[in-house]
A protein has these predicted regions:
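Short, contiguous alpha-helical
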Residues: 3-52, 91-125
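Residues that cap or delimit alpha-helices
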Residues: 1-2, 84
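Acidic/histidine-rich alpha-helical segments that form the ligand environment
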Residues: 52-90, 101-106
Length: 125
């Protein structure tokens, strides 16, 4: 997917694939932070949750945001890979849920948004 396609909105007021990708990166970061007890405020973009895609879209900015998604995905995978069975039942840092529930939740979140992006790609064919 190129920058132009990633920035197409399926309808006015709806998120495009670019915004969904950065949103997914943010929540991978948030889950990683809670798994590792890192401090807040270290995400690569100011703000939280949803981030506007740049206007006009550029390939360089798109590649940068895809790299951001990959980076936070790898960080999260490394944190999850380092968990032991006993860790799954302990409370995640900064919340009421367990580590196991946090991991299942971020996996479900990722799948949901990956599906959205696949649907957007089909709409753009």
């Amino acid at each position: 997917m190129n920058a132009a396609k990633a920035s197409v909105r399926p309808a006015p007021g709806r998120h495009n694939a670019w915004e969904i990708a950065v949103h997914a990166a943010y929540w991978k970061y948030a889950a990683w932070r809670r798994l590792t007890a890192e401090k807040r405020g270290m995400f690569a973009r100011p703000g939280s949750n949803w981030f506007a895609s740049p206007t006009p879209p550029t390939e360089a900015a798109w590649r940068e945001d895809v790299a951001l998604l990959v980076r936070y995905h790898r960080q999260l995978r490394a944190a999850v890979a380092g968990l032991r069975d006993g860790d799954l039942d302990r409370r995640a840092a900064g919340g009421r849920e367990t580590v196991g529930r946090l991991v299942r939740g971020i996996a479900a979140h990722d799948l949901y948004h990956a599906g959205q992006i696949q649907l957007l790609k089909r709409l753009l064919r």
